[in-house]
Amino acid sequence: MKHLFSQSIFILSFFLLTGCKKNETTEIAKTEIPQNTIEYASGLSIVKHEGYSVVTVTNPWPNANKKFTYILKEKDVKVPDSLQKYSTIKVPLESVVVTSTTNIPFLEMLDVEDKLTGFPHTDYVSSEKTRKLIDKGAVKNVGQNEKLNIEQLIELAPDLIVTFGVDNNNPMLDNLKKSGLNVFIQADWMEQSPLGKAEWIKLYGALFGKEDKAKELFDKIVLSYEQAKKMVAAKQATSTVLYGSMYEDVWYVAKGNSWVAQFMKDARANYLWADLKGTGSEGLPFEKVLDKAKNANFWIATGSVKSLDEFAKMNPHYSEFDAFKNKRIYTFEGKLGATGGTIYYELSPSRPDLVLKDYINIFHPDLLPGYEFTFATKLN
């Protein structure tokens, strides 16, 4: 009997111990599974592992038939064999060439603008900080986006070229890769969520070994954006809004799921084309726009126009809109850098909180007494 009792205790102990080990292993496995650190951006994934990150760009351009995966690897770290097929980038970067002005603020926010060695068409850059680097020759002009100077890029030998494509046919990207240059295809411009665009700062945090700083900065932007939304939450979206201007006999309005439409929604305004499905813009004839928006309370115009007189000269029919008659026309594209670059194009994707506050000040100025626009200007 004693023998049977001892055997029973042994069997029970065995199952308890193995059960505990199984649960313990399961818990460890759960805590060790790396997670995507991206919350808002729909076209970017960053999964952090020990010594390396797997970065995936899933929607690089409209109707893309491919996605791009990159391994950001720290020095002396061995990447698993299953990931060897992907492009490997050694981080942190010591030098970089970027090809969109939207990338410049991310570099400056992370204090790595001194790592920038080249940019196409440097006149487009508005930031005073980076302009100083350009003026002293630290940042070279490397051609134009559609025709980068490959010989100069080879001579510069940056650790990485961060660029973008516009469709499935990208001969310039192919030429860069054939030349032995390391290329990263980014797609912040494809994001339609205001916070989604801004979250691409985390990519640059990963490239320069500043993940914590990038997260801290982005979290502050999210908080600022959400606070602005709460400020206006009790307001009724009664102000009707017209968007856009004529371009070669076509009026392009922002679609209802676009970046611009999202700002107007969050600012509690009644955008007249909010029900137009899709992202990007829709070309309409003037008559159709006039019929729908003649009595709109506000008009967000496109272009760097400075005054109502200048605006009227562009198209005399603009004066038929109530927003023109009542002097309620604003543009976000009127402020230019020292060499003609548009500040809004450069800075707004990384600071959606400032864009939203500008919109709120247009539609609900009582909420922000004494506020000065960051981007917007009123046409007088």
Which residues are covered by each model-predicted region?
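Bacterial Sec-dependent N-terminal signal peptides
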Residues: 1-27
